[in-house]
């Protein structure tokens, strides 16, 4: 049983970039498809199959509507990791006899970077674009990196670690002018910020259900039909999903993703106001009470549900232990098992000592003002205690530049 404090249930969930709780309305929509409406959506000879197929197609149209796509352009997958792999490897395999170059960014999600490294072993040339100190790519650098051999540019919309929003419209315009396919991992932005695949000239986009208050184990890949984009499938079988992703579709999960998309479509403005208000309250109150706290990533060009903060003079892991009443992360959930400082922060040029102090706080639909105030009070009290114990903080206060110290190795 979770302890309660003035109607506040502890621990407080603040890791919305790792996953989100299922919205009760999503759960309600899914339940019948686990029980009475259990048909296979590919069974065309009876009403159980028709009922499931109708539910799948309705969900498909809900997902498409949220990004301005055509219903037929949505391919269901197991999640954004599979979608990213299908997009990047699928394009590379289909077009490798014509072109052999892909461009991505050093701060992409690990599954994009690993898919690209896999392709490098198969002879595809990969360019990893740097990011500026604010976490955003430089558009001129992108333009200059595109050659006549470039088949794909892959840039995520919202970074999972630092929350910065890349200029997708400008990137899409460059790609279209140069005749290069544009893929975006939109898992952290789908349903949270306005995304229009046509206005942004996006050719492929990866979507995840559990980042928008839907179930885990379901995602989608948007694949443009006009001009047509071709991908070689990763999974062979019955030819479902326009031949791009074989396997029986999990109707309950798809219904959940569809309902989550429908809610996001109708409530995006309300959610955005809520998240922006709590972000400003959290950050302003932290800055009023503690010195040398740094927001990682551009303050304005970002999704404000993500607060990645560095607390100078405090080790991030010790901070997480000290604030165990808050469920937070010191990196992306896929890489936070490692004690290495975040590769995203390091690629922004942030020094190792500050990168090690970074903690990501996630704010979402179900975060309350009371939870944010409790979090701020807890953080401030623990920071003061940890800094009082920290020889590094003492040295910094004495004006010693930690970058210039040569540490002895025992």
Curated annotation (Swiss-Prot):
The modification N6-(pyridoxal phosphate)lysine is found at residue 211. Keywords: 2Fe-2S, Cytoplasm, Iron, Iron-sulfur, Metal-binding, Pyridoxal phosphate, Transferase. Its cofactor is pyridoxal 5'-phosphate. It catalyses: (sulfur carrier)-H + L-cysteine = (sulfur carrier)-SH + L-alanine. Pfam families: Aminotran_5 (PF00266). GO terms for molecular function: 2 iron, 2 sulfur cluster binding; cysteine desulfurase activity; metal ion binding; pyridoxal phosphate binding. GO terms for cellular component: L-cysteine desulfurase complex. It is found in: Cytoplasm. [2Fe-2S] cluster binds at residue 334. Pathway: Cofactor biosynthesis; iron-sulfur cluster biosynthesis. It is an enzyme of class 2 (transferase). The active site is at 334 (cysteine persulfide intermediate). GO terms for biological process: [2Fe-2S] cluster assembly. Its main location: cytoplasm. PROSITE patterns: AA_TRANSFER_CLASS_5. InterPro entries: Aminotrans_V_dom, Aminotrans_V_PyrdxlP_BS, Cys_deSase_IscS, Cysteine_dSase, PyrdxlP-dep_Trfase, PyrdxlP-dep_Trfase_major, PyrdxlP-dep_Trfase_small. Pyridoxal 5'-phosphate binds at residues 80-81, 160, 188, 208-210, 248. It comes from the Bacteria. Gene3D superfamilies: Aspartate Aminotransferase, domain 1, Type I PLP-dependent aspartate aminotransferase-like (Major domain). Its EC number is 2.8.1.7. Master enzyme that delivers sulfur to a number of partners involved in Fe-S cluster assembly, tRNA modification or cofactor biosynthesis. Catalyzes the removal of elemental sulfur atoms from cysteine to produce alanine. Functions as a sulfur delivery protein for Fe-S cluster synthesis onto IscU, an Fe-S scaffold assembly protein, as well as other S acceptor proteins. Belongs to the class-V pyridoxal-phosphate-dependent aminotransferase family. NifS/IscS subfamily. Homodimer. Forms a heterotetramer with IscU, interacts with other sulfur acceptors. This is Cysteine desulfurase IscS. It comes from Rickettsia peacockii (strain Rustic). The gene is iscS.
């Amino acid at each position: 049983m979770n302890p309660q404090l003035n109607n506040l249930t502890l621990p407080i969930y603040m890791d919305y970039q790792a996953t989100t709780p299922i919205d009760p309305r999503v759960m309600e929509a899914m339940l019948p498809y686990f029980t009475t409406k259990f048909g296979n959506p590919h069974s065309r000879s009876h009403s159980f199959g028709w009922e499931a197929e109708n539910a799948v197609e309705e969900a498909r149209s809900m997902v498409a509507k949220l990004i301005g796509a055509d219903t037929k352009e949505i391919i269901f997958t197991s999640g954004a990791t599979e979608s990213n792999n299908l997009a990047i490897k699928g394009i590379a395999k289909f077009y490798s006899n014509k072109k052999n170059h892909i461009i991505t960014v050093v701060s992409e999600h690990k599954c994009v970077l690993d898919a690209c490294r896999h392709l490098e072993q198969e002879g595809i040339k990969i360019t990893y674009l740097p990011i500026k100190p604010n976490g955003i790519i430089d558009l001129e650098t992108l333009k200059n990196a595109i050659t006549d051999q470039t088949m794909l540019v892959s840039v995520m919309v919202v970074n999972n670690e630092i929350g910065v929003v890349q200029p997708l419209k400008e990137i899409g315009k460059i790609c279209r002018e140069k005749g290069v396919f544009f893929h975006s991992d939109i898992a952290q932005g789908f349903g949270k910020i306005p995304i229009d695949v046509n206005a942004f000239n996006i050719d492929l986009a990866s979507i995840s259900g559990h980042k928008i208050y839907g179930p885990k184990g379901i995602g989608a890949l948007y694949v443009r039909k006009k001009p047509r984009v071709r991908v070689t499938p990763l999974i062979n079988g019955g030819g479902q999903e326009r031949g791009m992703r074989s396997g029986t579709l999990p109707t309950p999960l798809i219904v959940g993703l569809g309902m989550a998309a429908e809610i996001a479509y109708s409530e995006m403005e309300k959610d955005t106001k809520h998240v922006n208000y709590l972000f400003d309250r959290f950050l302003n109150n932290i800055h009023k009470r503690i010195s040398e706290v740094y927001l990682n990533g551009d303050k304005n060009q970002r999704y404000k549900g993500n607060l990645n903060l560095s607390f100078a003079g405090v080790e991030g892991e010790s901070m997480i232990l000290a604030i165990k009443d808050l469920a937070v992360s010191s990196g992306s959930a896929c890489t936070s098992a490692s004690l290495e400082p975040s590769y995203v922060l390091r690629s922004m040029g942030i020094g190792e000592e500050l990168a090690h102090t970074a903690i990501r706080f996630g704010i979402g639909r179900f975060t309350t003002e009371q939870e944010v105030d409790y979090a701020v009070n807890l953080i401030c009290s623990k920071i003061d205690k940890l800094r009082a114990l920290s020889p590094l903080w003492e040295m910094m206060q004495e004006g010693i530049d930690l970058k210039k110290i040569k540490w002895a190795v025992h």
